[in-house]
Every structure is written in structure tokens, then in C-alpha cells.
Amino acid sequence: MPHSSDSSDSSFSRSPPPGKQDSSDDVRKVQRREKNRIAAQKSRQRQTQKADTLHLESEDLEKQNAALRKEIKQLTEELKYFTSVLSSHEPLCSVLASGTPSPPEVVYSAHAFHQPHISSPRFQP
């Protein structure tokens, strides 16, 4: 019995039968959705990690800021103290009262003999 031309033609056909085409499209859709779901999950994880990192960095910067503000306050207090010491010393200082400009070595050496203010326990190392 000879083969019908329909059966020989279908063996050389490149497109699957209509039922199989729908099935392979469904498989591709499912695979694409799964791939997209995984990509979205990874993206959310990266976003969460970035937010956590920024939060930790923010906390660290807040601590640094607080420490710097504390240091500014301390230095401001020291400036007030030394300004007060200088103000009380100026009227008693013969080197500063002379009015003639002196080299820094002379001024500092002359002042090395009377420094009761700097020996204050407040500013000892």
C-alpha cells in the first residue's frame, strides 16, 4: 500500500502541530515569568541591601557629627579660657606693654618664666 502524500509532507514540516505550538508557548511563558520573578527578587534584595548600607553609613556619620560637635564645644571653651587668661595677663606683662615689636623668640622666652595660667589642672595632658 502506498503512503499518502499527507503523511510524508508532515514529516518534513518545520512547524509543530497546532496543539504542540500552544504547549511550547505556554512553557516559554512560564519560563519567562520564572526568570522575571527571580530577577525581581534579586533586584529587591539589592535594594534592601543598599538601604541597609545607607542606614549604617548614616548612623556612623551621625556619631561622627556628634563627636565633632562635642570637640567644637570643648575647643570653644578652651578659647574662652585662654582669651580670659590673655586678657588678665596683658595689663601685667612688661613685654607686651613696651609697645616695641619683638621677635617671637624673645616674647616666648620672656614669658617662659611666668606661666601660672597654663599650669591650670584643667588643661593638663
From Swiss-Prot:
Localization per Swiss-Prot or TrEMBL: Nucleus; Cytoplasm
Modification type Phosphothreonine: residues: 48
Matching InterPro entries: AP-1, bZIP, bZIP_sf
Tissue specificity statement from the Swiss-Prot or TrEMBL entry: Detected in postnatal and adult lymphoid tissues such as thymus, spleen and lymph nodes. In thymus most concentrated expression is found in the immediate cortical layer. Differentially expressed during T-cell development in thymus. Highly expressed in Th17, Th1 and Th2 cells and in activated B-cells.
Effect caused by changing residue 77 to K: Does not affect interaction with IRF4 and ability to mediate differentiation of Th17 cells. Retains 50% of activity. Loss of function
One GO CC annotation: cytoplasm
Domain of life: Eukaryota
Region (Leucine-zipper): 54-75
Family affiliation: Belongs to the bZIP family.
Annotated protein name in UniProt: Basic leucine zipper transcriptional factor ATF-like
Organism: Mus musculus (Mouse)
Encoding gene (name): Batf
